[in-house]
Amino acid sequence: MAQKPDETLLRADTFTNVPKVSRRTLTKEEREELAKQQAAETKEAEKLAKTASKGAIGRWWRRLQSGPNKISLGMAIVALGVVYGDIGTSPLYTAQTFLSGQGGIANTDREAVLGMLSLVFWSITLITTVKYVLIAMRIDNKGEGGIFALYSLIRRHGAWLAIPAMLGGAAFLADSVLTPAVSISSAVEGLKTLPPLEALFKENGNLTLMITVVIIVVLFSVQSRGTESIGRVFGSVVLVWFTFLAVVGAVNLSGDWSVLAALNPVYGVKFLFSPHNAAGIAVMGTVFLSTTGAEALYSDMGHVGRGNIYFTWPFIKVALVFNYFGQGAWILKNQNNPEYQHMEGLNPFFQMMDPNVRYVAVILSVTAGIIASQALITGAFTMVSEATGLNWMPHLQVRYPARTRGQLYIPVINWVLCLSLIHISEPT
């Protein structure tokens, strides 16, 4: 009589390559956690399948959510505060700098306004949309972006590549000093446009500087305590800020849609080399103010996700374009207005609003300036830490004020930046 084969030799899991896990080795808590994970995966799969059944758009959305460019509404809002705070404050001072370089609003004709708008639009398009969004963000180091992440990918090709990487890091640290000073001071200058405070600021010429310095000192003083709790609302505030930019710009643009002719790049090229351009080629320095902070789209890619930047950038660009073109329409409308022809430091951003709306604009602009500064300060801490890891900087004391090690605080860098900001803010 044939011997009955051992049943364990015939079990399916005895001749498969799939690793076996004995349930007897799992604790009750581990089994519950595993069940929760399986339930979450099943729920997500059902959600994607339901979305895919809605047609071509649904199938595209399913592929997107299953890939590396996954979009999350929560992280998209976080991206607004982390990535776009810097570029979002550029409308505060770009048009003001342009008018100053041209000798005032009385010397700024239609050709100059359309030329400037054209240069701004195409600079944002080529530098931010094409260079960073379409090209640079495809070159990542395991999902991370930034100058040092890019250097890590190419360092094996030559030691000399450390030089451009160092220059890029130095440029970012310089931006961490210049941009907060300009953003905060430009926002504080909005107080001058409020009727109840006009006389006060005329009597006290240094009042803007004093308020700016107080904000800077307070901002750097709280760094040692961490900004984790404040950071949660940054994205929502920046969302309100960009919506405000778009609405105010659209209101003024509706009065003169002809400025949309500046979408033609010919206007920008003609103005750049035109004798009407009082600033000459130096006007490009003003133009590039509109792209300040564009590098954050690439450097913060690892923090917020590539897909969330792809998702939010169209809204950001539309809001910026509406605001810049709205300021251009206001300049053309008030070119011959004697009230503005001799006004010192004329800022179209605040002047194009109703006086009652300016109160909201000042509050939002100061808040946006602080958020932009916070993003740059945090980025400076991270960059110095990375440079220290590459032995490019001396080892400095690093603290972790948050519950996680994701947020850094470097005391020496903090106060060097603070003093540098105060020095930059001083009038020349």
For every predicted segment, state its role.
Residues 132-157, 185-195, 229, 233, ...:
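Flexible loop linkers connecting adjacent transmembrane helices
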Residues 82-91, 146, 167-188, 286, ...:
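Membrane-helix boundary/coupling elements in multi-pass transport proteins
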Residues 135-139, 215-235, 287-306, 425:
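Membrane-water interface regions at transmembrane-helix termini and the short interhelical loops
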Residues 131-135, 157-182, 192-225, 248-251, ...:
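Helix-loop-helix module between adjacent transmembrane segments
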Residues 155-163, 202-214, 310-322, 389-421:
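Loop-to-transmembrane helix boundary motifs in multi-pass membrane proteins
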Residues 422-428:
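Residue-level detector of conserved catalytic or cofactor/ligand-binding positions
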Residues 240-266, 277-281, 290-294, 318-336:
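Hydrophobic alpha-helical segments and their helix-loop junctions in multi-pass secondary transporters
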Residues 70-79, 113-114, 130, 159-171, ...:
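Select transmembrane alpha-helical segments in multipass membrane proteins
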